[in-house]
Swiss-Prot record:
UniProt region (Disordered), positions on chain: 79-125, 217-254, 268-314
InterPro entries, A to Z: Znf_C2H2_sf, Znf_C2H2_type
Sorted UniProt keywords: DNA-binding, Metal-binding, Methylation, Nucleus, Phosphoprotein, Repeat, Repressor, Transcription, Transcription regulation, Zinc, Zinc-finger
Record-linked Gene3D superfamilies: Classic Zinc Finger (3.30.160.60)
Protein name: Krueppel-like factor 12
Role according to the record: Confers strong transcriptional repression to the AP-2-alpha gene. Binds to a regulatory element (A32) in the AP-2-alpha gene promoter.
Native source species: Homo sapiens
Compositionally biased intervals (Basic and acidic residues): 217-226, 299-311
Compartments it resides in: Nucleus
Location (main, coarse): nucleus
Keyword Nucleotide-binding: no
């Protein structure tokens, strides 16, 4: 009878050990043995003296520690393979982190939630975007502002996450850095690529393409000013009307302008611009002056201001007659002065019966007021008026002396 009871006790112990091995990962607890219903009625089972050794045998069985205690180490990252599919329903949220270099996503398993949370807190300082995607629903929900995460697709057994960045409607010059400006900054090396513009005139003509290279940096290049008319009307006015500019003669202006135009044309012949090249092929190789050349009107003005003292002497117009050393700043004044030496009087009075002639036009105007009686110069202190400005100046001096 005692041998039979010992066998049953050993059998129960083996059964509990098998249960402990099946429950892998569960903590070891002290379990009180329960007898079968057929053995509960026998009084010899409770009186067996060796039954107290059963808890001692269970204490000798060492169970594996739980995984929660193993994941306490916050300095270890997850190295196990992770299933990236988002179609499966999970109870725990999946953390997806996308880096700008490799675009790989890592998710935490339900057993190591604390490890993934600690690793995500350490990686928060790096320039990455961490978005939480709830995989229990069919559509992915992005909790933080960032790129949209589409459904995963597998190629060759590998899972990939499609990260879609919202692209604002902008010009082609807005590069990839403009798209990701609200998410994170990525250092992008941009190379200048020439832009090709195609102009189609008519079905009979061949497409003319103009290649305009993009400037990498505006420091080393001059400002390109598009002016289809060539010279501005202000410059042409200064070239034609020399009396409005003091200390500038018509000869010096024409000489400076012709020099600038000749230099610009020489530069265009050596390095023709794409626009002039297309125009030359279209209009029988006739090259038009274009203001894209580095010699613009502003450069000629700067060159004119910073001239040498020798060029300033050219602006002083001297009378070349013997014994006359008069100097004028305008060429018209010098021409009028030279008429006094030559005796030429081209300006004649047109009043009937008057035969007066004058060397200057202003003298003729003053003389003509004698015939008409016009006195445009009026005194502000009294009611008198005069036909000449110098007479009014003498009259006002008298008022000041009184």
């Amino acid at each position: 009878m005692n041998i039979h009871m010992k066998r049953k006790t050993i059998k129960n112990i083996n059964t509990f050990e098998n249960r402990m091995l099946m429950l892998d990962g569960m903590p070891a607890v002290r379990v009180k043995t329960e007898l079968l219903e057929s053995e509960q009625g026998s009084p010899n089972v409770h009186n067996y003296p060796d039954m107290e050794a059963v808890p001692l045998l269970l204490n000798n069985v060492k169970g594996e520690p739980p995984e929660d205690s193993l994941s306490v180490d916050h300095f270890q990252t997850q190295t196990e393979p992770v299933d990236l599919s988002i179609n499966k329903a999970r109870t725990s949220p999946t953390a997806v982190s996308s880096s700008p270099v490799s675009m790989t996503a890592s998710a935490s398993s339900p057993s190591s939630t604390s490890t993934s949370s600690s690793s995500s807190s350490r990686l928060a300082s790096s320039p990455t975007v961490i978005t939480s995607v709830s995989s229990a629903s069919s559509s992915s929900t992005v909790l933080t502002p960032g790129p949209l995460v589409a459904s995963a697709s597998g190629v060759g057994g590998q899972q990939f996450l499609h990260i879609i960045h919202p692209v604002p409607p902008s010009s082609p010059m807005n590069l990839q850095s403009n798209k990701l400006s609200h998410v994170h900054r990525i250092p992008v090396v941009v190379q200048s690529v020439p832009v090709v513009y195609t102009a189609v005139r008519s079905p009979g003509n061949v497409n003319n393409t103009i290649v305009v290279p993009l400037l990498e940096d505006g420091r080393g290049h001059g400002k390109a000013q598009m002016d289809p008319r060539g010279l501005s009307p202000r410059q042409s006015k200064s070239d034609s009307d020399d009396d409005d500019l003091p200390n500038v003669t018509l000869d010096s202006v024409n000489e400076t302008g012709s020099t600038a135009l000749s230099i610009a044309r020489a530069v265009q012949e050596v390095h023709p611009s794409p626009v002039s090249r297309v125009r030359g092929n279209r209009m029988n190789n006739q090259k038009f002056p274009c203001s894209i050349s580095p010699f613009s009107i502003e450069s000629t003005r700067r060159q004119r201001r910073s001239e040498s003292p020798d060029s300033r002497k050219r602006r002083i117009h001297r009378c070349d007659f013997e014994g006359c050393n008069k100097v004028y700043t305008k060429s018209s004044h010098l021409k009028a002065h030279r008429r006094t030496h030559t005796g030429e009087k081209p300006y004649k009075c047109t009043w009937e019966g008057c035969t007066w002639k004058f060397a200057r036009s202003d003298e003729l105007t003053r003389h003509y007021r004698k015939h008409t009686g016009v006195k445009p110069f009026k005194c502000a202190d009294c009611d008198r008026s005069f036909s000449r400005s110098d007479h009014l100046a003498l009259h006002r001096r008298r008022h000041m002396l009184v």
